[in-house]
Amino acid sequence: MVLHAQPPDQSTETAREAKALAGATDGATATSADLHAPMALSSSSPLRNPFPPIADYAFLSDWETTCLISPAGSVEWLCVPRPDSPSVFGAILDRSAGHFRLGPYGVSVPSARRYLPGSLIMETTWQTHTGWLIVRDALVMGKWHDIERRSRTHRRTPMDWDAEHILLRTVRCVSGTVELMMSCEPAFDYHRLGATWEYSAEAYGEAIARANTEPDAHPTLRLTTNLRIGLEGREARARTRMKEGDDVFVALSWTKHPPPQTYDEAADKMWQTTECWRQWINIGNFPDHPWRAYLQRSALTLKGLTYSPTGALLAASTTSLPETPRGERNWDYRYAWIRDSTFALWGLYTLGLDREADDFFAFIADVSGANNNERHPLQVMYGVGGERSLVEAELHHLSGYDHARPVRIGNGAYNQRQHDIWGSILDSFYLHAKSREQVPENLWPVLKRQVEEAIKHWREPDRGIWEVRGEPQHFTSSKVMCWVALDRGAKLAERQGEKSYAQQWRAIADEIKADILEHGVDSRGVFTQRYGDEALDASLLLVVLTRFLPPDDPRVRNTVLAIADELTEDGLVLRYRVHETDDGLSGEEGTFTICSFWLVSALVEIGEVGRAKRLCERLLSFASPLLLYAEEIEPRSGRHLGNFPQAFTHLALINAVVHVIRAEEEADSSGMFQPANAPM
C-alpha cells in the first residue's frame, strides 16, 4: 500500500465526496453497514427505545483508552485516562450519565457509517433536507512524545507512535447548507459527580470542565474548537450554519499535549492517526480471501483493546452491557484475563502480529512474577496496570443499558478458584517459546510453579472457565486444562534440558487424562460438563483444540457433533443449558459467539469442513454494521448482547476463519492441512 507523504488536501476531495455520498462507504464494510441498518431496527426493542442496539456503536481506541459512539454521533462511553477509569461519558448505561454529540440539528439517523480502511477512524455521512455533512472521529495517535524523560506508565518497549489523549472530531459540509450542533455534557465518576465549565481564555473557542466535587481527584477535560462555545450549566453547546466547503473541528483533551487550535492542525492530526493505523495493519499477514475484511477488522479491534503501556489485553471496552435483556448478568470486562492469553497468542501469531503477542506475554510475565523474581499466586484476571484487587461494587444510581441492572464495576471473579488458568498460561509459555525457539531463562521458575499448582489442585473442584457463582464443581474442561499445564510443561522442560521434570510431568499428565476419560465421558462417548453428570458444555470443544485427544478419536467426534446438534439454538452455540448448571444467577442468556466460532474450528478438525464453512458464513453475517461483535448473539433476532466489542469473540473468529481458509486451500493442494494452532 502506498501511503501519503503529507496530509491530503481535503478541499480537493470535496467534489468527489459529494458525488459519492449515496454510497459514501467502500468495500464490504460499507455494504454491510447499509444492509444491516434495517436489521438493527427490527431486532431491537420498540423503535423509540432511547438506547441504541449494542451492535450499532462504533469503537475507537488510542491504545490507552477507548470510546463508543452511537449512530446519532454521540460519544456515550469514554473512561479516562485508562479504559478501566470511571466514565466521563456514560449514556450507554444511563441516558443522563454524560454524552458528547456532534452532528446536524434535528437529524439522528445517518446516511452511512464506515471506518476509514485499515483504521479505527470513524466516518459518518449525514443528509439533511438542505445539505450533506461528513464527520470523522478519532482518538488521536502521534509520534512518541517522551523524548527528554522516560514515561512513568509505559513498561513495554517504546514504539514509534503514542496516544495523544485527544478525542478529535472534524466536520466538512460537502453540499448545500446544514445546521450543525454540538453538545458536550460530561458526568464524572460514573455520573456520581456533575461538571463545572469555565472558559479558558477571553474568546469562545475553548472551555474547561472539572468535577464539581474534589476536582483535583478527577480528570480535567479541555474542549477546543473553531465554533463559538456557550456554557449552559453542565453542558457546553455550539450551533452554526455550515455551507459547502466549510470546516469545523472539535477536540476534547485530557492531557499535557496541546490540542489543535485550527482546522488545518486538526486535519494534520487526523491524517497522522490514519497513517499510524495503516502502518500498523500493514505488518500483519492477511490472506487474499473474501473474509479478509473480517480478519483485519478483528485484528484492529484487538489492537484497540490493548493497553499499550503494559501490553494488557482488555476482555472488552465496557462494563455491564447485559447478557440477558433487562437481566442481572451484567459484568465489568475492562480487565485482562489470563485465559485470554492462549487465544490471544494463537490469533496474533497466526496473523503475524508478533509484537502485540510478545507485549501481552510480557504483561503475563509481569503479573506472574517472572520479570522481577517474585512469587505471586496466579489470579484469574488483573487490572490493565497489573492490579490484583478488583473489588466488585454495584452502581445503583444508574439505570443500566435498557434498564438491565445492576451496573457493576470491578469483578468479583478475580479471586475465584479457576483451575484452567494454569493450562492457559503454560500453553502461552509454550507458544511463546515456539515462536522464539527457546525458553527464556527468567520463565523457567514461573513455569515450574504453575505446573506445581496444577499438580496440587487438579483433583479439586473449581468455578470453571465460565466463572459460575454457584457451588464449585469438578468441571471436565478445568481438568483438561490441568492436563494442558502438565503436557506443555513437560515439553518445555525437555527444551530446557530438565529431563527428570519432563518425565515426571508427562506421567502426571497421563494420570489426569486417564481420570478424565474415566469420569468425564458419558455412555455415548461424549465429554460432559462435570463429573457424574451428562450435561453438555461448549468448553469441551477445547478437547480437540488443545490436542487433549486427536481429531480422529471417536470421543472427540461424538462430543463435537453432540454440541453442534444438542447445545445450539438456531445453529448457534450456548455455553451450557442454564437449567442444567448452577451458575448462581437467574434468567436465560444468548448464544456465546466465541463458542460458535470454537465449533467452526472443531468441525474443521474432525473433517466436517462444509458444515464448518456454512456455520462460519452464518456467524460472519451476524457481525455488526462495522464488523464488530459483542459477547453473545440472540439467534432469532441477531441482536448482540453483552459487553462490546469482545476480545474473546474476535480472537475465536480469527482462529475459526483461518481454520476454514486453510482447509479450503488444502482441498486444492496435495499437502497436509495444518490447523491454526497446530503443535510443532
Swiss-Prot record:
Its cofactor is phosphate. It is an enzyme of class 3 (hydrolase). Keywords: Carbohydrate metabolism, Glycosidase, Hydrolase. GO terms for molecular function: alpha,alpha-trehalase activity; trehalase activity. Its EC number is 3.2.1.28. InterPro entries: 6-hairpin_glycosidase_sf, 6hp_glycosidase-like_sf, GH15-like, Trehalase-like_N. The keyword Hydrolase applies. Shows an absolute requirement for inorganic phosphate for activity. The function of the phosphate may involve stabilizing the protein conformation and/or initiating protein aggregation. Unlike the threhalase ortholog in M.smegmatis, does not require Mg(2+) for activity. It catalyses: alpha,alpha-trehalose + H2O = alpha-D-glucose + beta-D-glucose. One of its GO terms (cellular component) is plasma membrane. GO terms for biological process: trehalose catabolic process. Coiled coil: none annotated. Residues 1-27 are annotated as: Disordered. Pathway: Glycan degradation; trehalose degradation; D-glucose from alpha,alpha-trehalose: step 1/1. Pfam families: Glyco_hydro_15, TREH_N. Catalyzes the hydrolysis of alpha,alpha-trehalose into two molecules of D-glucose. Homomultimer. Belongs to the glycosyl hydrolase 15 family. This is Trehalase. It comes from Mycobacterium tuberculosis (strain ATCC 25618 / H37Rv).
